[in-house]
Regions:
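Cleavable N-terminal export/targeting peptides
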Residues: 1-32
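Transmembrane beta-barrel domains of Gram-negative outer membranes and organellar outer membranes
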Residues: 22-165, 169-256
């Protein structure tokens, strides 16, 4: 079975498993919120314009499943095609699994969710060939998802990434603190949402080097359970990110 077959088979399995748990309102927009209690699965394609004239095509499936009204399990699997090593290479790149415990809170009188959890990141590719990350890591996280009104979501989040197994080809271990600021606005007149996601990183193995990437996402639900979105990532030309110049992508989202 090829990679697209694997991804679509995985999506079908998740769609067929119908949970009895209630989902939050505006679930199409809330699925882009890491602190929201929703069940969904995305199938996504992204193109990355890398440094030195190289590029990368990434085929991904990402989603979340509520094991309990307060316990969320997320998944992400990536397959890439890249010429960053000088020739075309294809492989599975990385698997991510994340468990998040959600607690309803109301600081300053604002409806919110406290999110505490941890993420496991498993390298599946080859770092030398550009198809792998070169490290297996764990990443505890803490964040608050703010809901000031029915149309806006604001998420403040921080993770610490620590590699416990590193490829010999990689110069440094992973020791990174990653603050994140997300704004999501529901667009009921369009049946969709807009998301701005600023992802920052402080590399403690590289003289506390600060890096950042901005993701802009616009999506629309075409039915209560199916939607789609497009996204743009801005890299070093705008925000001094060294990983890539820019990235564009699109996805199908299934709520279940």
């Amino acid at each position: 079975m090829n990679v697209l077959g694997i991804i679509f088979s995985s999506l079908a399995i998740f769609v067929l498993i119908r949970p009895a748990l209630a989902q939050e309102k505006n679930s199409g927009a809330a699925a882009s919120d890491p602190t929201a209690a929703v069940n969904y699965q995305d199938v996504r394609y992204r193109y990355f314009d890398l440094d030195r004239g190289a590029d990368k095509h990434s085929f991904q499936t990402e989603g979340a499943y509520m094991l309990h009204p307060r316990l969320k399990l997320t998944n992400e699997l990536r397959y890439v095609n890249t010429d960053s090593s000088g020739k075309s290479e294809q492989d599975f790149e990385e698997l991510k699994l994340k468990g998040i415990h959600l607690t309803n809170i109301k600081p300053f009188g604002i409806k919110a969710k406290l999110a505490l959890g941890a993420e496991w990141l498993k390298d599946l590719g080859d770092f030398d060939k550009g198809t792998g990350t070169g490290a297996d890591s764990i990443a505890p996280l803490a964040g608050i998802g703010w809901v000031p009104d029915d149309r806006n979501f604001i998420i403040t989040l921080v993770q610490y990434f620590y590699s416990y197994d590193t490829d010999n080809a990689r110069d440094e271990d992973v020791r990174e603190t990653a603050p994140r600021l997300i704004w999501i606005r529901s667009l009921p007149e369009l049946g969709g949402w807009f998301k701005a996601d600023l992802k920052m990183s402080i590399d403690h193995e590289d003289d506390e080097n600060f890096d950042q990437v901005l993701e802009l996402q616009l999506g629309k639900m075409v039915s209560p359970s199916v939607g789609f979105y497009g996204e743009v990532f801005l890299g070093d030309d705008v925000l001094d990110s060294n990983a890539y110049n820019y990235s564009v992508g699109g996805a199908v989202r299934v709520m279940y």
